[in-house]
Amino acid sequence: MKRVVITGFGIISSIGNNKKEVLNSLYNGISGITFSEEMKESGMRSQVWGNIKLENKKFFKKNKISRFMNNGSIYAFLSMEQAIKDANLQTKQYQKNPRIGIIAGSGGGFPKYHIQGIDAIRSNRGLNSVSPYIAIKAMNSGISACLSTLFKIYGVNYSISSACATSGHCIGNAFELIKFGKQDLIFAGGGEEVSWELAYEFDAMKALSSNFNKNPTKSSRVYDVNRDGFVISGGGGIIVIEELNCALSRSAHIYAEIIGYAATSDGKDMVVPSGDGAVRCMNLAKKQNKMLFIDYLNVHGTSTKIGDLIELEAIKKSFFHEKKPMISATKSMTGHALGVSGVHEIIYTLLMMKYNFIAPSINIETIEPSADNMNIVQKTFHKKIKTALSNSFGFGGTNVSLILKKY
């Protein structure tokens, strides 16, 4: 079986729109959460989000394909441009090559376009008032469809949609395809737009934070006793996953090797995690490398009352006979980017591995008793990270664990 490495990445997020900006935010514990006037005007309880701040959108007119692109696709497109440059890939190396593919998706979908179409029909303006591009803009697979067309990808081309584990599954699936020799290189990740049309669905569940609307940067507070729900976010992220010999043959810089991947199902509840599924997932990922010590664990931790505690208990069980790793929750800075959070957190972890630090879990004023003595990093901690594990979980009991080793 082949060895699989990461040779580049690109990111659009609430804490920065490139490697340099994101690194600065991570290292200094800077929150990307802001007040949302749109959520307030929509009558929502939660009025904070991790919005994306882009100064210009000239790229939107780059190609006729842009008519089919939603904001999530645009964020993923910008991320892929960065990733190609970061991986030092030349056009002739990835275009029209059947050994190079893309797997990228969205967890939340794009309901704003469904709403636009329905509003047009209900206003009696007729079917002719509905944009013919809505069907593509609204579908979850629009991201991989648009990117594969724009970048002339000839290999695999599809989206995975598994709630907040989406881009984690995209990465894991890409890893396995390369490991078993079916592809040489895959662009993996996803995109998620930030909109009240998506946020209200979670606000209706009372899953979002609402107690810190007047102090947005304090609203995402994983492991603090006063946490009251997650903060919705979004963005784009693409990583370049490559077969080791392929990467070496072109003298590529290698950030890390993917040495473990597992995906499991709770099979228990639609919204409340079982914990057992997470334990099995981490154990299966670790089982692929015996005598492996994990230096750092980037938790799924979203700032919900129940979910954070269940994941902590799962970590305790999974590492019961091992030394517990250092832990931090980057969503305390970024908010929850839903389907793109998995690839975002792999990128955050890659930056920490490269620059020898662990980003803090911010906003912990009074730590949850169950989180005490769990090696949770609350201030930037300087440490060489050789191996790291990242968790992504989603509604319906879907779980992903990925393990990276510094190359």
Swiss-Prot record:
Residues the record marks as active site: C164, H300, H336
A GO term from the CC aspect: cytosol
UniProtKB keywords: Acyltransferase, Cytoplasm, Fatty acid biosynthesis, Fatty acid metabolism, Lipid biosynthesis, Lipid metabolism, Transferase
Gene Ontology molecular function, alphabetical: 3-oxoacyl-[acyl-carrier-protein] synthase activity
EC nos: 2.3.1.41
Span of domain Ketosynthase family 3 (KS3): 1-406
Any single biological process term in GO: fatty acid biosynthetic process
Keyword Acyltransferase: yes
Alphabetized InterPro entries for the sequence: Beta-ketoacyl_synthase, Ketoacyl_synth_AS, Ketoacyl_synth_C, Ketoacyl_synth_N, PKS_Beta-ketoAc_synthase_dom, Thiolase-like
Alphabetical list of SMART domains matching this protein: PKS_KS
Chemical reaction(s) catalysed: a fatty acyl-[ACP] + malonyl-[ACP] + H(+) = a 3-oxoacyl-[ACP] + holo-[ACP] + CO2; (3Z)-decenoyl-[ACP] + malonyl-[ACP] + H(+) = 3-oxo-(5Z)-dodecenoyl-[ACP] + holo-[ACP] + CO2
Subcellular location, record wording: Cytoplasm
Chief location of this protein within or outside the cell: cytoplasm
Pfam families given in the database record: ketoacyl-synt (PF00109), Ketoacyl-synt_C (PF02801)
Lipid metabolism in keyword set: yes
Record-annotated disulphide pairs: none
Pathway involvement of the protein, from the record: Lipid metabolism; fatty acid biosynthesis
Quaternary state and interactors: Homodimer.
Family stated for the protein in its record: Belongs to the thiolase-like superfamily. Beta-ketoacyl-ACP synthases family.
PANTHER family, per database record: 3-OXOACYL-[ACYL-CARRIER-PROTEIN] SYNTHASE 1, POLYKETIDE SYNTHASE-RELATED
Function: Involved in the type II fatty acid elongation cycle. Catalyzes the elongation of a wide range of acyl-ACP by the addition of two carbons from malonyl-ACP to an acyl acceptor. Can also use unsaturated fatty acids. Catalyzes a key reaction in unsaturated fatty acid (UFA) synthesis, the elongation of the cis-3-decenoyl-ACP produced by FabA.
Record-given protein name: 3-oxoacyl-[acyl-carrier-protein] synthase 1
